[in-house]
């Protein structure tokens, strides 16, 4: 396989990734685009996989210390190669978030959880994971007044919001619409230990080029909204 075939890009070429056991989808770009507006010195990506989300985030946010955790050593090996390809230093931890015992907390925690159903993929050790437990374990790693951000299937968004509402405030809900004009994904951002109001955005189309091609953050996209979005 040639180098051109072996590597694909995200965010208009700003992020380069090796084709491997799992190739990140647009969900990674969307998650990063909403999380990138958060000031943070430290970030944890729960279920980092091959690094798509955290690398997209680092392309738009000058975070000094990045950490990823994943139960799959094969995924982490791919992530390490992708981090090197993008000249990024990411601490990688081979552990299961469901039973990871650590006092460490982070300014920002992001996760693109294994919410999908169907035939388990070899790379997805947490196929059909308990989404509520996953979210609670992830939120537990956020510093007080820090930020949690996730992207989920719209069908489980209410479960996720209910799971984090007891410890989070300032919840922002951002729907992503398919061609059927119904939300297919929902990005959720919240702050731990606050009690601010919930904000629901109008959302954008899932194929919005300003995010996927141009690599803008969601706030920048909304400020210069393209009619096609």
Annotate each PLM feature.
Residues 30-102, 108-111, 117-119:
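Conserved SAM/SAH cofactor-binding pocket of Class I
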Residues 14-16, 65, 89-91, 169-172:
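Conserved beta-strand segments of alpha/beta enzyme cores
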Residues 80, 121-123, 161-164:
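Short amphipathic alpha-helical segments
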Residues 3-42, 48-60, 189, 205:
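SAM-dependent Rossmann-like transferase core, predominantly class I methyltransferases
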Residues 130-183:
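Conserved Class I SAM-dependent methyltransferase catalytic core
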